[in-house]
């Protein structure tokens, strides 16, 4: 829900803003607006939004559930891109373990293109996440350079948990040891890794392809 709106009258007129009822509206100078907007090209309006808090108890389990485990991912832009892809590919929940980045970083929110506010995100310790997944019979697939199988050679069984690791180190030893199946994306021309958000999109859409078309 939107709690407050800040706007710069030199960029946008108040009458052009669709303001929700009971929302505090504050006019600010161009100087102040530039300080709080974090970028030069904006629409002239900034909202303070209260985000829902989620816990693992609120994750409803069904036979088409996909959960992402983001294990120590550091770059805000990558997390934001993953949130966007997750919304597009029907991911239910994102669990963050080994936290290295504040999910409220402006670059996370900006690069998610609104998906930040639509995605269930929870923080868990590794052991807590594993216990939850095992209890609810998730099949745990980990994206790993050490995998023997490629993502195309796997028939994905729901409910699914997909683990993606940090940009520099990949998944942690914990998830290397506790995943059910490790998968990788084949690459040519001496390239040994892809951006984590790209890897996430590739594997998620293969799961969607199998689920929707049975191919």
Residue ranges and their predicted role:
Residues 141-191:
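Active-site/ligand-binding-proximal alpha/beta "capping" segment
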Residues 38-40, 44-64:
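Acidic/glycine-rich phosphate/pyrophosphate-binding loops and surrounding catalytic core
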Residues 85-89, 103-116, 173-215:
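Structured adenosyl-cofactor binding patch, chiefly the S-adenosyl-L-methionine
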Residues 45, 111-115, 157-160:
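Short, hinge-like loop/turn segments at secondary-structure boundaries
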Residues 1-37, 139:
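N-terminal positively charged helical leader segments and presequences
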Residues 13, 31-36, 127-131, 148-150, ...:
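A short acidic, often aromatic-flanked loop/helix-cap motif at beta-alpha or helix-coil junctions
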Residues 10-11, 30-33, 99-101, 167-169, ...:
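Short, acidic/turn-prone active-site loops that include or flank metal/cofactor-
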Residues 4-8, 26, 58-147:
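RNA substrate-binding interface of SAM-dependent RNA methyltransferases
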């Amino acid at each position: 829900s939107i709690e407050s709106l800040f706007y710069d009258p030199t960029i946008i007129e108040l009458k052009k803003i669709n303001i929700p009822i009971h929302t505090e509206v504050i006019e600010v100078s161009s100087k102040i607006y530039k300080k709080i907007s974090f970028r030069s090209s904006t629409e002239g309006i900034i909202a303070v939004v209260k985000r829902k808090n989620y816990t693992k108890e609120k994750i409803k389990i069904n036979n088409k559930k996909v959960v992402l485990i983001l294990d120590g991912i550091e770059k805000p832009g990558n997390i934001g891109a993953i949130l966007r892809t997750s919304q597009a590919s029907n991911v239910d929940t994102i669990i963050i373990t080994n936290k290295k980045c504040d999910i409220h970083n402006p670059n996370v929110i900006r690069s998610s293109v609104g998906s930040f506010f639509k995605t269930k995100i929870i923080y868990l310790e590794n052991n807590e996440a594993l216990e939850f997944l095992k209890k609810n019979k998730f099949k745990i697939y980990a994206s790993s350079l050490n995998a023997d199988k490629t993502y195309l050679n796997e028939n994905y069984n729901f409910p699914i948990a997909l683990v993606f690791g940090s940009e520099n180190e990949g998944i942690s030893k914990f998830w290397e040891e506790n995943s059910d199946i490790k998968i990788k994306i084949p690459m040519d021309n001496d390239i040994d890794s892809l951006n984590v958000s790209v890897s996430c999109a590739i594997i998620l859409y293969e799961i969607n392809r199998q689920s929707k078309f049975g191919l």
